[in-house]
């Protein structure tokens, strides 16, 4: 097994469909570039349309023949997640790669439109709901994969209080 791995090692992705959440910057943008460069059809799932359009232009400028498109997705909204899944499923009959990358970190206390604490709602519940809504298509697509991107930030927390995920019974700490 090689000691290192790079974008050049990505096998041909022609004919494969990928969704990348949080594709407007950072790892999501670079993942979109890499997959498009390997021939995948990439759906960049982004919340902010202005940043998403700039990211789309970045991918197209770096990969001349990129098969890439934008779809709006706000993981802090179950309505947006349902709308995204419905639109995707109405336009595609396969999903080879679901890259759950979007996330927020160490933000002030806030709530999703459905009332969940923002970090739990966006980073965990949103991706869980999205994956669940796309699961049938993932299961029907031979060789499909789900990749959940995470960081080492969990090391800075005391752990999840499963009895108070919304910080209703204790003081909010953006690192918890």
Where are these regions (language model features)?
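Rossmann-fold NAD(P)H-dependent dehydrogenase/reductase core
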Residues: 2-176
């Amino acid at each position: 097994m090689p000691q290192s791995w790079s974008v050049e090692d990505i096998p041909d992705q022609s004919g494969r469909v990928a969704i990348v959440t949080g594709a407007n910057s950072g790892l999501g943008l670079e993942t979109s570039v890499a997959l498009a460069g390997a021939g995948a059809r990439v759906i960049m799932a982004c919340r902010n349309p202005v940043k998403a359009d700039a990211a789309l232009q970045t991918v197209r400028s770096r990969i001349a023949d990129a098969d890439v498109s934008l779809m709006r997705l706000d993981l802090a909204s179950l309505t947006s997640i349902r709308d995204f899944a419905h639109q995707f499923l109405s336009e595609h009959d396969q999903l080879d790669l679901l890259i759950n990358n979007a996330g927020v970190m160490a933000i002030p206390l806030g709530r999703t439109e459905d009332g969940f604490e923002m970090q739990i709602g966006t980073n965990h519940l949103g991706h869980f709901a999205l994956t669940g809504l796309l699961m049938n298509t993932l299961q029907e697509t031979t060789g499909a994969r789900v990749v959940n991107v995470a960081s080492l930030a969990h090391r800075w927390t005391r752990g999840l209080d499963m009895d108070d995920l919304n910080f209703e019974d204790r003081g909010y700490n953006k690192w918890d």
